[in-house]
Amino acid sequence: ADSLGGGIGMANRLSFAMCRDLLDDVVLVTEEEIYRAMQVLYYEDRIVAEGACVVGIAAVLSGKVLPQGPTATIITGRNLDMAMFTRVVTGQDVILGDKVIEGKTYGT
């Protein structure tokens, strides 16, 4: 997800320290898992969400995070590229720099 690419580096005097102090774990999800999470939120809950905000959902759906008890994640959509979102929810390929995320129709 494009908006996850910056802002928390070691030189960032605010975000890095806050993340270091408050995070329990860090999990890496793939662009394909983000793609799928965007589809799930749209088709299951009718939520239009940007890629960066669905990483928590992607981690759960992929089995990389196994929630125990009530679990929450923040879902936003303000920085959403609607053309890209339309490609995702309609199962089309998405080009991210030099990488192509192969489209897949939801539910298949």
Where are the regions that the model predicts?
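A generic structural signal for secondary-structure junctions
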Residues: 5, 9, 90-93
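Generic secondary-structure boundary/loop-capping signal
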Residues: 1, 26, 45-46, 72, ...
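Glycine-rich beta-alpha junction loops
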Residues: 4, 8, 32-34, 53-55, ...
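Phosphate-binding loop/pocket of nucleotide- and phosphate-handling active sites
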Residues: 55-108
